[in-house]
């Protein structure tokens, strides 16, 4: 459970993406955008990559799959916690600082949401949260995506719709 002592100070950030016009989007994975070997951080991305994106003439950055995920090899597309940014790259405040700084630079920020499937793991995430294999997915094989080795959402369920829309609002 993340509970910072002080709320994040957005310093009056009131970014208005509608003033940008046509978007020229730079897509990046925070953990893989660094030149060094290893997992990059939100802080490194803020300090080193955002200025390059701005200098190169982009007006938006799309952050690939930032939600918490147990397997780094999935590039963040095996989501386990839909309401938590990846702890591999830093703290939630460091991600907020990345967004705040991008806005200061005039860059819109687009967050890549993964709502097609989720990690099938039993120890992390929402699979078998209620003891069944179908709280958020169809039961049995119909709820399994073999190519991604993950669980599929059952979009016909009202609970799934509410869950995913809540995630969009988050």
Regions found by a protein language model. Name each.
Residues 4:
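NUDIX/MutT-family hydrolases
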Residues 7, 13-20, 29-170:
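Substrate-binding/active-site clefts of carbohydrate-active enzymes
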């Amino acid at each position: 459970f993340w509970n910072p002592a002080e709320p994040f100070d957005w310093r009056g950030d009131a970014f208005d993406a509608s003033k940008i016009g046509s978007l020229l989007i730079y897509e990046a994975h925070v953990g893989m955008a660094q030149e060094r070997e290893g997992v990059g951080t939100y802080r490194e991305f803020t300090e080193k990559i955002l200025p390059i994106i701005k200098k190169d003439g982009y007006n938006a950055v799309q952050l690939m799959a930032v939600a918490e995920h147990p397997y780094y090899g999935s590039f963040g597309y095996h989501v386990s916690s839909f309401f938590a940014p990846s702890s591999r790259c830093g703290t939630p405040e460091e991600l907020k600082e990345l967004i705040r700084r991008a806005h200061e630079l005039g860059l819109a920020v687009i967050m890549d949401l993964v709502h097609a499937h989720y990690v099938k793991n039993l120890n992390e995430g929402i699979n078998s949260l209620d003891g069944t294999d179908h709280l958020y997915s169809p039961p049995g094989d119909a709820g399994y995506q073999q190519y991604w080795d993950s669980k599929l959402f059952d979009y016909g369920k009202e609970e799934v719709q509410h869950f995913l829309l809540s995630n969009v609002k988050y």
